[in-house]
Amino acid sequence: IESNNLNHGDDCRLVMSGNEFCGNATMSYIHYLKERLLIQHQQFQLRVSGCSHPVECKVHSQHYEVTMPKVHQVKERFVKLGDQQFKAFEISYDTYIHYVLMCDGVDLAMKQRVEDFVSAQTWHQQFKTIGVMLFQQDKQFIYPLIHIPKIGSLIWENSCGSGAASIGVLVNYLTNHDIQDYLVNQPGGSIIVSSRKSGQNEYQTTIKGQVSTVATGQAYIEQETMTQI
């Protein structure tokens, strides 16, 4: 669920239902604002939940681009899924954390083990979102599982912008080379990622994607369920 508040077009902000940050929702929000002629420039900033500073955004002819939150740390570790140990890369941010697991194939049993792992952990309260990306590197393909503790959700998503960004960071980390327009494929489509190393364990990362409006309508939400940015 995304909500937005507009104050004569000067105070644009996006608030997610779990107060988390979402790259895909930010791209969708840019599209929403552009359709309603509420943005006048190709490059601008938006305030988004889960991010303490304004988010840099760009409008291209075919894509919307979002500068992603900065990485705090990339760490190699092992996670136990069922009876097996898997090598994983832990990528942490201000308000969310991702685990990337390299795999050759993904089946229902593997997905269930990942769900069990996420559900069994006690996550630090700073993390609004926990994500696990099952990454088939040869196909540049991910299966993203997203958990939002505040609302108790645990969903295999068709597309995850922040997960795609973490893949860009990981490829940069593993190759020690900046990447430009790296295609991250997902069940629901593809996202373009660029990642540049800007310091010790620091990465400047952007995602680009295409957005179209498929339906419009009115949403009625109980006031007490709404979150504040």
Describe the residue ranges of each PLM region.
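N-terminal, positively charged, Ser/Thr/Ala/Gly-biased leader segments
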Residues: V79-D83, A88-E90
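Ligand-binding beta-strand-loop-alpha-helix segment within the catalytic cores
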Residues: K70-H72, G82
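A glycine-rich beta-to-alpha transition motif near the start of alpha/beta enzyme domains, typified by
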Residues: I1-Q62, Q73-V74, S92, I97-I229
